């Protein structure tokens, strides 16, 4: 697959393309709306389950968004099925259902964890978001044009 993000060679650990589908909306309730992408974990070799910093690009758009990607089974609120979902920084209120989205996994942050409460999960998501912002700032000189690192943010 060609590199749709104009990322430097080797920056993306893994890329994945799929259609945004409806989820449980838990991320939205926690203040971290996500684009859920249908996938079959048996369809190919996938990276290990966990949380990643990445870049997302919607089909038809030239820019990308820094994002937090979760690939796994959500042990705090188990669904039983593996999912891929991405929280796009700076894109909190846009309806993405039905759109095609490409994700580039760029940095493995941590394994999935079971949290004692939804508040503890939300606090970890805040830390993950800060990690994503730091990654973007640290890598900004290496990212090529066309990537909106912090859309709608000062």
Model-derived segments and spans:
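Phosphate/ribose-recognition catalytic cores of enzymes acting on nucleotide-derived substrates
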Residues: 2-154
